[in-house]
Amino acid sequence: MAERPDFIRHWRELEGPDDGAYPGDTELMSIGAPLGRLLGLTRLGIHHERLLPGRRTSYPHAESSEDEFVFVLEGTPDAWIDGTLHRLTPGDGVAFPFGTGICHTFLNNTPQEVRLLVVGERNKPENRIHYPLNLEYLKTRPDAWPDVPTRTLGDHNGMPRVEIDAPTDPE
């Protein structure tokens, strides 16, 4: 069998360290493998994200100029969308069109690990971002989105919690 080219790799070979946190915050987020960038893509961002129990992928946010798509590979995360939780299962996909102001993050409120495939456009210089629940952090961002479309937020605070009594997978 021929030697595999550099653009064929397993996500485990490309995963970064478990140290993803926002500046000034100690909360660990998901553990990512930037597949697109490390495999040579220049216009498309593709990330494999592992979400350990009690973690979230990011602060809730919306983007002005970049589409984003999240596909559940494994586990049952909650999609936090505009302050409301939506339980997902493997095979579910969620799309966030740019410019809509739909704020989102993904929470692992279960005792099992979650794996996600996150696809979007590579960082665009014109993109602006909004963090509706992290306004102090937003003030530090030179790319803050000042005229984000107004959307009603539900009551959920965007923080994960692990369901202690949730059923566990015996395998």
Question: What would you call each of these model-derived segments?
Answer:
Residues 1-43, 130-131, 135-171:
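A short, N-terminal "cap"/entry segment at the start of jelly-roll beta-barrel domains
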Residues 29-34, 47-63, 101:
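Conserved short histidine dyad/triad with adjacent acidic residue
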Residues 41-46, 64-67, 72-74, 89, ...:
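Short connector loops at helix/strand junctions that flank enzyme active sites
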Residues 48-52, 62-80, 119-121:
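Short, conserved beta-strand element in jelly-roll/cupin
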Residues 58, 86, 127-129:
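Short beta-strand segments
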Residues 75, 91, 106:
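Short hydrophobic/aromatic patches on the structural cores and recognition surfaces of FHA
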Residues 83-98:
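Short acidic-glycine-tyrosine-enriched beta hairpin
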Residues 98-126:
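Ligand-binding loop in jelly-roll beta-barrel domains
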